Amino acid sequence: MALSGLGSGPEGNPNNHQGKAIPTLNPSHGQGPSFLFSWVSFLVPFWSWYPFSPLPLKGIPGENSSSPNGLKNFHGIGLNGTERGMGHFHPISGNRLGLRLTLVAGWFLEPFPTFLAVLIRTQGDSTPSRSFVAFFVGTLGLGQEGITGSFNRKIAGPATIDPQDWAMEEGVLTNFLWPPFTTFFRTTKGFPVQWHGEGSFVVPGIFSLPQPLPWWLLLPDTPTGAGKPPESRQHQPSHSMNGAIVDIPGGLTQTPSSPDRSSSTNSIADEEKKLDYKPTSPTSDTEKGESLPLTASQSEIIASPTFSEMIRVIFSGPTLVLGACYFCTFGAELSINSVLGTFYQRQLGLGLQNAGNLAAIFGLLNIVMRPLGGMASDLLYRKTGSVWSKKALLHTYCVMTGVFCIAIGLARSRSQATLVGLVSGGLAFFLEGANGLTYSHVHPYANGVVSGFTGACGNLGGIVFAIVFRYNSLDYSKVFWIIGAIIIGLQVATCWIKPVPKSVI
């Protein structure tokens, strides 16, 4: 991917209108709007969800009298709601209704339970608000789905990692800005006492209100899938998938003639090598952007799966590996983010603002560490040409995440330099890098099912690890090494699974 592509409009594939470069600095051309609004759509909903978790003890007066265990129960409610939302929205978007309509519907409803947080007075009041916010925030992963539908699979990895990076900075927004918001409502005359903490939820709610408009008014549906626009379909007049999931590249009965057949063959061989696939017949040239008279690239068409096909995809070995790894990394990130400020307060004796500033560093490093993970994966793949090498790197990152969790838990350090170094240095590097590595393995042909399952596993990990924090609320150091042991154990259990399904070989 050339740097010149960052500011220019990307070349598009005429068969499916997918961009072949990332127009990071040119959001007005080609797939630029899709890229821009995808990461914004990840950030703003998560910003509504996130403040419930890390700062309730100091931020919401109605919850100040709650027990720490009760607060962690509500954190679990939030994670469970997000998991349910992702499980519903991803398959609907990727395989049935289409991305645009699903996003517009979810985002239209999401601000209302966010505004309901202003009415929180007791623990019971926070339950419906937290649950419904979390459910609609399940749309946050659809930004990733929009990327894989709008860009060529060769750049789907970096195109997906960048938006998730920037969107995860909502943790930084919360830790840096929530204490000042709370202070503003507390010190400004005219605001009732109950607004001192809950009033801050008005801010992400206001930002959420205009979210559906760009997708509804400016953007088409994703170029592939059930909701693809007419101009994409007209290039594929005779395609009929009969509702079945299409296999990744296989033999085709007809291929176009080309004066430069040798270069096309070399390109095909490179793509086949990525899947460790040995062809028995010619393969499509769609990846080169050449028009095909009778068929399209099988690997880039998203079909509506039957229930049995969805089950087969979910329980395939590679999908389970993705789910297990994301369970470890994203689950750990969610749960650790929710207690990190409190952990720093206890271990280092800091106030709310200073502890929040240090905790924000962990989230801020997402913007660097996730791309580094994806870049390391790409570099290793170029050197080896084997998908196994990418899988081995993913497991290595996950194991090192577990090692640093165990180190933090056993060290019980009260030195600010040591503790912040372990958390924001070693742990952030491997944990957030592993999050970037995970999504580079998602197969586009079953995008909605695979990404929905993987995202749900990440939230399930957050629930499980939050439960561990809940039952060890007085000893967070112990929880760190327990989480580390779980992560390492899951890597040992899944490291032997092949990265490519047998049906594709």
Curated annotation (Swiss-Prot):
Keywords of this entry = Cell membrane, Glycoprotein, Membrane, Transmembrane, Transmembrane helix, Transport
Q: Which residues form the signal peptide?
A: none
Q: What InterPro entries does its record include?
A: MFS, MFS_trans_sf, NO3_transporter
- Gene Ontology terms, MF aspect: nitrate transmembrane transporter activity
Query: Membrane-crossing residues?
Result: 35-55, 313-333, 348-368, 391-411, 417-437, 449-469, 479-499
Q: Where can this protein be found?
A: Cell membrane
User: What family does this chain come from, according to its entry?
Assistant: Belongs to the major facilitator superfamily. Nitrate/nitrite porter (TC 2.A.1.8) family.
Query: According to its UniProt entry, what is the function of this protein?
Result: Major facilitator-type transporter; part of the gene cluster that mediates the biosynthesis of elsinochromes, pigments consisting of at least four interconvertible tautomers (A, B, C and D) that have a core phenolic quinone to which various side chains are attached and which play an important role in fungal pathogenesis. Once elsinochrome is synthesized, it must be exported outside the fungal cells, which is probably accomplished by the ECT1 transporter, to avoid toxicity.
Q: What is this protein called?
A: Elsinochrome transporter 1
The coding gene here is ECT1
